Amino acid sequence: MENVNLTGQFLVAMPAMTDPYFAKSVTFICEHNADGAMGIVINRPINMTLQDLFKQLNLPLAGALTDKPIYFGGPVQLDRGFVLHQPLQEWDSTLRIDEEIGLTTSKDILQAIAEGHGPHHFLISLGYAGWSSGQLEQELAHNAWLTVEATPEQRHRLLFGLPAEEKVQATMALLGLDFARFAEEAGHA
């Protein structure tokens, strides 16, 4: 699996995945290179809303976004916020994933969201999923994950347009697979 770059793709945990952080998860890969990989789990809302988070940060928030869920992004740096967003715009600390999507960790994006002039589409997580050099490739070789490519429209829908509980099935559908049937039949060839 040398020279494979999964940046901008999705990982779906295989049914045999027992790690509680990743079982039945969909992870969006934000960066993948020789040093390792990092991504955000996009289908695990936690018991916190945008209003709750902004209250903790002393940021006023009004309007329809107050009930927007905050997500568990992965087990690394759980005390830190990560904002996947579209469009890119200019923020203090943004990792450009592609021409449309960025991952920002600076507070200026949260301030802009609170004031109503942040990105149109965003997903906020606490924590991220990280892999050391070669670790993700090894997990892929052991069939821990399915990799899923998506068009920009499909990617936008998976990241920002679907409720969390529909993301595993919708991601698998891009491969022509039904997760429930796949889970039942895995290992019964």
Swiss-Prot record:
Domain of life per record: Bacteria
**Residues spanning the membrane:** none
Its cellular-component GO annotations read: cytosol
Any single Pfam family the record assigns to this protein: DUF179
Q: Which InterPro entries match?
A: AlgH-like (IPR003774)
Name the NCBIfam families for this protein: PRK00228.1-1 (NF001266)
As for family, the record states: Belongs to the UPF0301 (AlgH) family.
What is the name listed in the Swiss-Prot or TrEMBL entry for this protein?
UPF0301 protein Mfla_2099
* The species this protein was found in: Methylobacillus flagellatus (strain ATCC 51484 / DSM 6875 / VKM B-1610 / KT)
